[in-house]
Amino acid sequence: MALLRKINQVLLFLLIVTLCVILYKKVHKGTVSKNDADDESETPEELEEEIPVVICAAAGRMGATMAAINSIYSNTDANILFYVVGLRNTLTRIRKWIEHSKLREINFKIVEFNPMVLKGKIRPDSSRPELLQPLNFVRFYLPLLIHQHEKVIYLDDDVIVQGDIHELYDTTLALGHAAAFSDDCDLPSAQDINRLVGLQNTYMGYLDYRKKAIKDLGISPSTCSFNPGVIVANMTEWKHQHITKQLEKWMQKNVEENLYSSSLGGGVATSPMLIVFHGKYSTINPLWHIRHLGWNPDARYSEHFLQEAKLLHWNGRHKPWDFPSVHNDLWESWFVPDPAGIFKLNHHS
């Protein structure tokens, strides 16, 4: 009898323990579910779409980068993450410029670019040596520098953004396209200024059609070129199509065979992109890349046209922080003074 009573006590104890465990799990699960529900309810605000913008900051023209960033940040309410790319010896200066100026509120990451990846891929001779600067080729290596984003915007440093960058980010890329660019034949006003300053806007202006490797591509020399100073890129497609490796292949072929020259279209970075992306890119709204402002200090766009433009690009020799240049007032309104006093404007001869 005593044994039976003891067994019943043990069973009762086990039953109580089991009930306690079940009750604990239910309460704990309810708490976790509630937290999950809270997280889900907060997701739309907390996980607002992040727009990655990649821009380079070269030592001698860092003021250009900061002006571009200022113009982007000031003209949008979107959640922008700036990837500011520089060489190792400039990284500290980049951070100080941002953190000790009006740009301190921006969301940014500083990325180091190792120029050793370019070894053996660039011809040393050039009529425009500034185009051989390592950072000019950062756009070739976007997936190696930026990892967690599906879609990325790349901008040259000599641009000013007057529109909401979210509009550019919303550019539709066709299925199978790794990037979107702006065609060089896409605006009547652009064509007018092309004639005025003698610019090339076809493949003939960038590639040496006397060379067999170029002829074998089967690309008509009259094909309209595009400008890779503004890029909307799909990182998944870029990696899937091995775009970086294709670009490197043509860089190496150029070293061996001199297939394109900076003396043609001034495009040592543009030319391989024209080859690799021929017939396989989407287009950007022309107003999001109004360019050639730096080609001729005597060639000007109309004020009305400039006001309509979403993005201005001073590609060419005549930069808006230097003399001579055109429409530099539009650029200077976004200039962020260098806290270190190194970068200075030069608007007088």
Swiss-Prot record:
Segments crossing the lipid bilayer: 7-24
Keyword Zinc-finger: no
Cytoplasmic compartment spans: 1-6
Keyword Glycoprotein: yes
Chief location category: membrane
GO CC, one annotated term: membrane
Enzyme Commission number(s): 2.4.1.-
Keywords on record: Glycoprotein, Glycosyltransferase, Membrane, Signal-anchor, Transferase, Transmembrane, Transmembrane helix
Enzyme kind, highest EC tier: transferase
Residues that carry a glycan: 234
Membrane topology recorded in Swiss-Prot or TrEMBL: Single-pass type II membrane protein
Pfam families linked to this entry: Glyco_transf_8
Lumenal side: 25-349
Localization per record: Membrane
Family: Belongs to the glycosyltransferase 8 family.
Protein name, UniProt field: Glycosyltransferase 8 domain-containing protein 2
